Regions:
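Predominantly a Rossmann-like dinucleotide-binding segment in NAD(P)-dependent oxidoreductases
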Residues: 1-90, 217
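C-terminal helical cap and adjacent loop that interface with cofactors, partners, or active-site loops
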Residues: 23-30, 34-51, 96-111, 118-253
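Glycine-rich, charged/polar anion/phosphate-binding loops
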Residues: 86-87, 114-118
Length: 253
C-alpha cells in the first residue's frame, strides 16, 4: 500500500517514489521478496541457475490511480512534480505499480501477482496469499478479513488420499518440526482441511524480519562467505523480475 502505518507512524514517501523511472515498477519491487519466499520454501538450499533452470513465460502490468489529494497526503508535497506529468491522465496520476508473471524453475510452474492499493483495508495491512499444489495436498497461506488479517497456514488434503494415512503422516511431520518449534500444533478443521497452528506470541513481526535479513547481509559483507546457492539464486531472482518488466512493457505496446 502506498499510504500505511509502519511502527505506529504514517509512512511518508518521497515524491520520486511515484516515478517508475526512478523507483522502478511494482512488478520488480515486492516481487523480489515473493521470489525469495518461493525459493526458500520450494527449493531449500538448492542452487538455481537462471540460464538453465528458469524460464519466464508471461508478464503484464497495470496502473494504480493516485489523486493529488492522496499524493499530497503520502508525500507532504502539494503538487505533482513536473517529472510525473507523463503519467497524469485527467488530473490523476497513474502509477505502474501492479503486475503478474508466470515462470518455471526446474520445471515447476509458478505464478505471482502483486496489487498495490492506496490504503489498506480497515484493521488490515499489507496482505499475502500463497497456494502451493502438490500431489497429496495443497498448502495455503491465507491472510484475509475472515481471519482478522492474520496469516494462517492451512493444508488441504487431495480427495483421493486416504484420511487415516494422511493424518498419520501429517502428525509425524509436525512432531519432527516440534523438535525445533515445540509450540507448533495441527488442528483438524474438517473436510480434509488442517490448520498448522502457530501462537501469535511466537511469530516474528515485520521489523524483526528486516533485522534478521540485515544481520545476515552484514555478515556476508564482513566475512565474504555468502553460500554459492545464495549468490546464484540472487542472480536468478533479478533475472526473473527484470525480464518480467521487459515483457510487460512490450505487451503494452
Amino acid at each position: 500500500h502506498f499510504f500505511k502505518t509502519v511502527s505506529g507512524k504514517p509512512l511518508i514517501r518521497p515524491a520520486w517514489y511515484y516515478d517508475v523511472e526512478q523507483q522502478g515498477e511494482g512488478i520488480a519491487d515486492v516481487t523480489t521478496h515473493l521470489i525469495d519466499l518461493i525459493n526458500w520454501q520450494c527449493f531449500p538450499d538448492k542452487t538455481i541457475h537462471y540460464q538453465s533452470d528458469v524460464t519466464v513465460n508471461a508478464a503484464k502490468h497495470w496502473a494504480t490511480p493516485i489523486t493529488l489529494a492522496e499524493f499530497s497526503q503520502s508525500t507532504q508535497v502539494d503538487s505533482f512534480p513536473a517529472y510525473l506529468n507523463r503519467y497524469i491522465k485527467n488530473d490523476v496520476l497513474e502509477v505502474m505499480a501492479n503486475g503478474s508473471l508466470n515462470y518455471t524453475v526446474k520445471g515447476i510452474c509458478i505464478g505471482i501477482k502483486v496489487t498495490w492499493h492506496y490504503t489498506p483495508p480497515t484493521n488490515g495491512g499489507d496482505t499475502f496469499t500463497s497456494i502451493k499444489k502438490g500431489s497429496k495436498a495443497t498448502l495455503k497461506i491465507v491472510q484475509d478479513e475472515k481471519n482478522g488479517f492474520v496469516k494462517e497456514l492451512y493444508i488441504q488434503k487431495e480427495p483421493d488420499i486416504d484420511n487415516r494415512t494422511f493424518e498419520a503422516q501429517l502428525q509425524k511431520t509436525v512432531e519432527q518440526l516440534q523438535i525445533t518449534y515445540p509450540f507448533l500444533s495441527v488442528k483438524n478443521k474438517k473436510n480434509g482441511t488442517y490448520l498448522i497452528d502457530i501462537p501469535q506470541e511466537k511469530r516474528l513481526g515485520h521489523e524483526e524480519h528486516f533485522s534478521k535479513v540485515a544481520k545476515a547481509f552484514l555478515h556476508y559483507v564482513h566475512n565474504q562467505d555468502m553460500p554459492e546457492w545464495e549468490n546464484e539464486n540472487t542472480l536468478a531472482k533479478y533475472y526473473i523480475t527484470t525480464t518480467a518488466v521487459e515483457m510487460a512493457k512490450k505487451g503494452n505496446k
